[in-house]
Amino acid sequence: MADNGPPGLQFEWDADKAQANARDHGVTFEEAQTVFGDPLSRTFPDPDHSVGEERLIDIGSSTRGRVLMVVYAERHGRIRLISCRSVTRQERRYYEEG
């Protein structure tokens, strides 16, 4: 796992899930890490998918300039990436109106 996130944060993910996400959504988990360095990112809970563990959603700009939605869980002090994709128009508006 590459360390592209902001200093002080540790990331992890399932390698097969990361490969499938890149194939299906055109976004790598390496790029997704960089969203956590966006000071304007917006974070909110994902109660509909929080079965067994709390999942969170972060919408922010990557270092490639793309606004992404990243789904993750916090486990043992690490951020476990679950999925990421480019935002919809409505999600982009939510981010921009911050």
What is each PLM-predicted segment?
Residues 1-98:
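Ribonuclease/tRNase effector modules and their secretory precursors
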